[in-house]
Structure formats: structure tokens, C-alpha cells
């Protein structure tokens, strides 16, 4: 039975500062490193032996995977990386404080940019310090597809080919697959797996550093509801994600 484990990277330095991050390559905070270690401990406690790891091209996801697999005594696992697992590109919001953005633009526009399915934020200037145009991480990617902004719908469009071409093959070969990625790339994948509507996906928040397990059939459809390896911590973490950007 194919098994898929999803883990959102631990708290990053910009999560800690409440900044829109997107494709900006920031590292894990000390808290995030502890979360990643706990993720690995949970994998070990659950007896989950990973066969292959898929990550994005962003350091916070790579760090999370490395720390987690180290804690699980599975650092030897083969790794595949793809820009298609990157976080959603937040356009001109990248590097902006979430609370200040909320105050400047109002609740309605803030929520549309942050959580609507198909409305992207304003595009980033290609010459902006937080643009990824010309970034050597993406030297093998057609420059025409390196985004200047994205909605969740656009994330799904660029993620699903990787799911179909790479991840699905590993699962159908009987491998236990770990994906270490980001809040929105994982929301996109969960939407696909659980057939969540465009409207309902706005309410889905994925906590940092807690493995989410899917058991799948031969058609890669869930055989039962997915489950977190620490449900109580996952509920608290999801609530914290939902509250991001609100005034303190």
C-alpha cells in the first residue's frame, strides 16, 4: 500500500518575523530546527521508514528534511529536489510584514491575497531584491515560467506535473515517500489528494514540522482520512498559522 508523508518546513526566520516569504530563500529559526528534529522523532516513533525524499529548492525545506531524517536515523535516503515544490510566490508582498500589509490594505484585500484560490498578489518587479529572476537555483528552469507572483491555482498548475511525473511513480513502485515542502505547495497537494473544493481550501492551514500521513490505494486515492503523527500539536499549529498577520 503506497504511503505518503508530508511535512511543512519548521518555523523559518521570516515566519518568526511575520514576513511574507514565498520564494525568498531564508533559513530555519532555532524553533524551526527543533520542530524539524521533532518531526524526525515522530517518524521514528511511528516506525515509518522513508524510501525517497522530495523537497523544494528552498533551504528551509531542505534543512527540515535533513534534520528530520537525521533524527529518524535515515540520512541515507535518496533525495529529489524540484522548484515545482517551492512555496507559492507572493509577488510584491515578498519581504513585507504581514501585520503592516493588513493595516495598509485592509482585511478583505489581505485575505484575498493570502487565501483566495485564484487571485494572486501584485507582481514583483524583476529587479526587486526579493525577485528570483536570474537566481542560479533555477538555471535549469525556463525563465518564462519563473513566476513574478502566484495564486494557489497557479501553484497547483506547476506542482501537478511533478506529482504525476516523479512522485506518483515512486509511490506506485511501493516506496514510502516523504515530501518536505511549504504551506501552500502542500495545501495544493492536499487539495488534489482530498478533492477539496476551491472554496473550502481557503480554510485549510498546515502546521509547521508535524508529519501528515496518507495511506493510498493503487490509484493513489486515500484509503482512509490522512492523519498527523501528533494531532494535538497539529491543531494548535494550524490555529497559529491561521492567526498570522493579525495585529498583536
From Swiss-Prot:
It is found in: Cytoplasm. InterPro entries: His_Pase_superF_clade-1, His_PPase_superfam, PG/BPGM_mutase_AS, Phosphogly_mut1. One of its GO terms (molecular function) is phosphoglycerate mutase activity. One of its GO terms (biological process) is biological process involved in interaction with host. One of its GO terms (cellular component) is cell surface. Substrate binds at residues 8-15, 21-22, 60, 87-90, 98, 114-115, 183-184. It holds the Pfam family His_Phos_1. The active site is at 9 (tele-phosphohistidine intermediate), 87 (proton donor/acceptor). The record marks 182 as: Transition state stabilizer. Pathway: Carbohydrate degradation; glycolysis; pyruvate from D-glyceraldehyde 3-phosphate: step 3/5. It catalyses: (2R)-2-phosphoglycerate = (2R)-3-phosphoglycerate. The keyword Cytoplasm applies. Keywords: Cytoplasm, Glycolysis, Isomerase. Its EC number is 5.4.2.11. Belongs to the phosphoglycerate mutase family. BPG-dependent PGAM subfamily. Has antigenic properties. This is Phosphoglycerate mutase. It comes from Candida albicans (strain SC5314 / ATCC MYA-2876) (Yeast).
Amino acid at each position: 500500500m503506497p504511503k505518503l508523508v508530508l511535512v511543512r518546513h519548521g518555523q523559518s526566520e521570516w515566519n518568526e518575523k511575520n514576513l511574507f516569504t514565498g520564494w525568498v530563500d531564508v533559513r530555519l529559526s532555532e524553533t524551526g530546527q527543533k520542530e524539524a528534529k521533532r518531526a524526525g522523532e515522530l517518524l521514528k516513533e511511528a516506525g515509518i521508514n522513508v524510501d525517497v525524499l522530495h523537497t523544494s529548492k528552498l533551504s528551509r525545506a531542505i534543512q527540515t528534511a535533513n534534520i528530520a531524517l537525521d533524527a529518524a536515523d535515515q540520512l541515507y535516503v535518496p533525495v529529489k529536489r524540484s522548484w515545482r515544490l517551492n512555496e507559492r510566490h507572493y509577488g510584491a508582498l515578498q519581504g513585507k510584514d504581514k501585520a503592516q500589509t493588513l493595516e495598509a490594505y485592509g482585511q478583505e484585500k489581505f485575505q484575498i491575497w493570502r487565501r483566495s484560490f485564484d487571485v494572486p498578489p501584485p507582481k514583483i518587479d524583476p529587479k526587486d531584491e526579493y525577485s528570483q529572476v536570474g537566481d542560479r537555483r533555477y538555471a535549469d528552469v525556463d525563465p518564462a515560467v519563473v513566476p513574478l507572483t502566484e495564486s494557489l491555482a497557479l501553484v497547483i498548475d506547476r506542482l501537478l506535473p511533478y506529482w504525476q511525473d516523479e512522485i506518483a511513480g515512486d509511490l506506485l513502485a511501493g516506496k514510502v515517500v516523504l515530501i518536505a515542502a511549504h504551506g501552500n505547495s502542500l495545501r495544493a497537494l492536499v487539495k488534489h489528494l482530498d478533492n477539496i473544493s476551491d472554496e473550502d481550501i481557503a480554510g485549510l492551514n498546515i502546521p509547521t514540522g508535524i508529519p501528515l500521513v496518507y495511506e493510498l490505494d493503487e490509484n493513489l486515492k486515500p484509503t482512509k482520512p490522512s492523519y498527523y503523527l501528533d494531532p494535538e500539536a497539529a491543531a494548535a499549529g494550524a490555529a497559529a498559522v491561521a492567526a498570522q498577520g493579525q495585529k498583536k
